[in-house]
């Protein structure tokens, strides 16, 4: 999916995050993959995860989130810095179980970039358990 480079990088990054959340909660793998650049990276503690392609991303998420996971919500998203082709977002993430009980609450830094004709998440660093 090729997108025009918009006037506001921050607005584009926030739109990526909205699409990512809806695709994740709907378990729509193709839509989710469209919100990520590959290879995609995630730093948790000192462990760097790398997904070279979309094929294993969603199954890996299910393993990370646990069997109790039912949905994710962004508690807050704040633009930290933006340039014409990169945006840093500070995100507070909540995960909920099927009874809508909070099962995870953590901060994450997302880096959304415009490359290969589209805005998508390239990297994130999370303080997840």
Regions found by a protein language model. Give the residues of each.
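A short, structured loop/turn motif at beta-sheet edges
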Residues: 79-87, 113-118
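Short beta-strand edge/turn micro-motifs at domain boundaries
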Residues: 103-129
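Short beta-strand segments enriched in hydrophobic/aromatic residues
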Residues: 36-37, 93-95, 125-126
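Hydrophobic/aromatic beta-strand elements that line small-molecule binding cavities or substrate pockets
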Residues: 74-80, 92-95, 107-113
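A solvent-exposed, acidic/Ser-Thr-rich amphipathic alpha-helical stretch
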Residues: 29-81
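Short, low-complexity N-terminal intrinsically disordered segments enriched in polar/charged residues
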Residues: 1-38, 55
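Short, well-ordered beta-strand segments in beta-rich or mixed alpha/beta enzyme
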Residues: 20, 32, 42, 86-96
């Amino acid at each position: 999916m090729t997108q025009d480079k918009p006037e506001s990088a921050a607005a584009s990054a926030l739109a990526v995050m909205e699409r990512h959340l809806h695709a994740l909660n709907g378990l729509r793998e193709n839509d989710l993959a469209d919100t990520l650049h590959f290879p995609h990276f995630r730093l948790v503690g000192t462990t760097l995860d790398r997904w070279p392609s979309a094929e294993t991303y969603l199954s890996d998420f299910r393993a990370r989130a646990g069997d109790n996971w039912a949905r994710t919500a962004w508690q807050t998203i704040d633009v930290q810095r933006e340039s014409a082709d990169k945006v840093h977002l500070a995100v507070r993430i909540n995960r909920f179980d099927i009874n809508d009980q909070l099962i995870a609450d953590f901060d994450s830094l997302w880096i959304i970039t415009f490359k290969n004709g589209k805005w998508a998440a390239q990297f994130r660093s999370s303080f997840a358990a």
